[in-house]
């Protein structure tokens, strides 16, 4: 009896140890200790971005503003999805990024969060929502995460107040991406959408600002529209990844605006041409225009919808009853038109008409 009990206890202990060993092979992703199974669709983390950076593997980032664009970015396996305030221009049609509000940005953030399950999600802090005080900056960042479903925020510029804002947001436990060089929210100071770092003082300022953002705790810095040597210097000087847009090939990663890289807006009213730094990987705008023109033509010529796109049927007996009810209501013409349409659809469906 005692020997049997010992064997039973040992057997249960062995199974328990086996279970523990098996589960310990799965990485623990939270401080609460719940081991999670590895999943190819698991959200990209800051740790993974740092690992890519250390290995010298380029980081990919693309903007998204709604559910469909987020799904496409998710499917492509892009590392980071930025809900940019560029939505003001490419979605809302403004000339600059300045008019978009926090409430509008939150709508975009929520839509993207529903569509992009894998990329790290970064939301821009729109102009006027973080400049007045550190409290305002932290409150806005909290809303972008809690209400927008983002994983991190991005803010522009490197003035002392922006550096302080970045530091305060990081201290509040929120990951921050910085942005230097051409900062669209500062176009009134910069004199328009102009490249930065083209002279000694400006180039040094780009590098120093990027370093200050790193010191403030930013996990990454966007370098926009600066000469490649300046971007290379900033990338070398930093321990965090740089993400270039119009900054040459020497950054830790690259970002482009969704609409620009897909060629969706051949003649945007806010720019004479697509930005010089942007490669168009498709001409989606032409495809859209062609499809819309074809649709318009087919509807105008009564070619759409045809039988193949009119799938819902009514039985002959129900049709007869329906026509009878129309006649009782005094809708003789409606009954006649309904009967004629049914006859026409039957003729279209017959083998001889195929």
Swiss-Prot record:
Binding site for 3-methyl-2-oxobutanoate: 85-86, 124, 154
Pathway: Cofactor biosynthesis; (R)-pantothenate biosynthesis; (R)-pantoate from 3-methyl-2-oxobutanoate: step 1/2
Pfam families assigned to the protein according to its UniProt record, in alphabetical order: Pantoate_transf
Subcellular location: Mitochondrion
Main location: mitochondrion
InterPro entries found in the cross-reference section: Pantoate_hydroxy_MeTrfase (IPR003700), Pyrv/PenolPyrv_kinase-like_dom (IPR015813), Pyrv_kinase-like_dom_sf (IPR040442)
Alphabetized UniProt keyword annotations: Magnesium, Metal-binding, Mitochondrion, Pantothenate biosynthesis, Transferase, Transit peptide
GO function terms (MF aspect): 3-methyl-2-oxobutanoate hydroxymethyltransferase activity; cobalt ion binding; zinc ion binding
Domain of life: Eukaryota
Residue stretch of the organelle transit peptide: 1-50
Family: Belongs to the PanB family.
Protein name from the UniProt record: 3-methyl-2-oxobutanoate hydroxymethyltransferase 2, mitochondrial
Species per Swiss-Prot/TrEMBL record: Arabidopsis thaliana (Mouse-ear cress)
